[in-house]
Regions:
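A well-ordered secondary-structure block
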Residues: 100-182
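Short, well-ordered surface patches within globular domains
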Residues: 43-110, 152, 158-164
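Bacterial N-terminal signal peptides that target proteins for export
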Residues: 1-10
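Short, contiguous pre-domain boundary segments
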Residues: 31-41
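A short, structure-level motif marking secondary-structure boundaries and short turns
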Residues: 39-42, 65, 136-137
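Bacterial N-terminal signal peptides
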Residues: 11-20
Length: 184
């Protein structure tokens, strides 16, 4: 009986510790996102929506307007998350040296002219399907960004008006990217 109680206590402590790691351990439900047939990468739309919702809640709590969802920015955010996942890196600068501004200028130079400001938040975490639900995973991601000064600054930047969120998951990894913009 004592050994069962000790085992339960150890497991509870380990689970609580994992929940509070800087890179949140989280889940992506395969039923809530599209799967790329060629790569097996999942794009869980419900998680993306929840991250957007929680980001806007954080802004409203700080007296700021909500950000408008932007499908073009979301596509760029998914591409960034896919790139980090497939090329196994975690950085705002890709292995080929490209930054967010470089990617914008290359992909849609005309569209880039309508944007006066852009910003990017990125996340990488292990994925445990049995560990949390979508709401908890989104909360862990956004809370992590809110405790990081640079990421918090992006979320609470009053100049930003639009946001795209892109999440990519495969095997045991999950990457999320937020791209913020201010339209001229």
């Amino acid at each position: 009986m004592k050994s069962n109680l000790k085992w339960t206590a150890v497991v509870s402590i380990l689970l609580a510790a994992l929940l509070h790691l800087p890179l949140a351990y989280a889940q992506v439900r395969t039923t809530s996102g599209a799967v790329s047939k060629s790569s097996g990468i999942q794009h869980p739309k419900e998680l993306e929506r929840r991250i957007l919702q929680l980001t806007n809640e954080a802004r409203r709590k700080n007296g700021l307007a909500s950000l408008y969802p932007d499908n073009d920015l979301a596509a760029k955010a998914r591409t960034k998350s896919d790139d980090m996942l497939m090329n196994k890196y975690f950085s705002h600068t890709s292995p080929d040296g490209k930054t967010l501004k470089d990617r914008f200028k290359e992909e849609k130079p005309a569209a880039f002219q309508t944007i006066s400001r852009i910003g990017e938040n990125i996340y990488m975490g292990a994925r445990f399907d049995y560990f949390t639900d979508i709401k908890t995973q989104a909360r862990m991601i956004v809370d992590g960004w809110m405790t990081s000064p640079g990421h918090r600054r992006n979320i609470l930047d009053s100049n930003f008006t639009h946001l795209g969120v892109g999440v990519s998951a495969k095997d045991k990894m999950c990457y999320a990217t937020q791209i913020f913009s201010q339209v001229k």
